[in-house]
């Protein structure tokens, strides 16, 4: 609980086993309430105690989503062919990821980057590592603690899956599938390669504290 207007010191409470909680709040004020649970993303809301009486009860529910084990796709972070430079659109997406990490301030994440299948395996692995690092560097520049971020490049080893518009089946965008369009539909050929040039993130920890970082440095 954070007192937005009155300046009262922030405090925490614990729910019961069913998730219920009760706390009297100072009247004539506004409160920012953030709910958290291990292995879940946080949720928050503001509660206004102006124009109510001491007998008024306010119900404020929170919905916490479980942190998935698999990587989470970040739609919109894409790269030009053979480049690790962030596009303007990618910067906007990373700004939203930055806000997410500021709110979920205990998460430690791995930024995963992938390439298309053109180029050697070694080159693509190095390129994807540079792409992942470019995202990490940007978030660090914005103010995220470096200890909360890891960059991991996977090269062309994990092609994306799409749903075939005709068969409605899941298709892995391997080079052998994409190459069928190289002559009959050049635009689609490039589009499918672009889908493989992507970045995602995976939560690898939810216990970050500044104290733990300081202990590692001692």
Which residues fall in each region the model found?
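Periplasmic OmpA-like peptidoglycan-binding domain that tethers envelope proteins to the cell wall
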Residues: 112-218
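Surface-exposed loops/turns
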Residues: 17, 27-28, 54
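A short, solvent-exposed beta-strand micro-motif common in secreted/extracellular proteins
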Residues: 27-39
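Structured interaction patches on ligand/partner-binding surfaces of diverse proteins
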Residues: 38-60
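Short, acidic Ser/Thr/Gly-rich low-complexity loop/linker segments typical of extracellular
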Residues: 4-20
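Conserved "repeat-terminator" motif of extracellular CCP/Sushi domains
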Residues: 57-70
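Short strand-edge motifs at loop-to-beta-strand transitions and within beta-strands
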Residues: 20-23, 58-60
